[in-house]
From Swiss-Prot:
It comes from the Bacteria. This is Large ribosomal subunit protein uL30. One of its GO terms (cellular component) is cytosolic large ribosomal subunit. One of its GO terms (molecular function) is structural constituent of ribosome. NCBIfam families: rpmD_bact. SUPFAM superfamilies: Ribosomal protein L30p/L7e (SSF55129). GO terms for biological process: translation. Belongs to the universal ribosomal protein uL30 family. PANTHER family: LARGE RIBOSOMAL SUBUNIT PROTEIN UL30M (PTHR15892:SF2), MITOCHONDRIAL RIBOSOMAL PROTEIN L30 (PTHR15892). The keyword Ribonucleoprotein applies. CDD domains: Ribosomal_L30. It comes from Paraburkholderia phymatum (strain DSM 17167 / CIP 108236 / LMG 21445 / STM815) (Burkholderia phymatum).
Length: 60
């Protein structure tokens, strides 16, 4: 059975955000505006997405 995945896209700039939030976005594998990363759907990843929910969008 395949692992469940979640795609996230960076939709807001990191300028003016907290350093810890920038590090979280980098941890999600996102670099530039509108970049997309596909990650395993784990509680840790969900928590990271929740922390920076105002910067990212979950796709599909």
């Amino acid at each position: 059975m395949s692992e469940k995945t979640v795609k996230v896209q960076l939709v807001k700039s990191l300028i003016g955000t907290r350093e810890s939030h920038r590090a979280t976005v980098r941890g999600l594998g996102l670099r530039r505006l509108n970049s997309v990363s596909e990650l395993q759907d784990t509680p840790a990843v969900r928590g990271m997405i929740n922390k920076v929910s105002y910067l990212v969008k979950v796709i599909g």
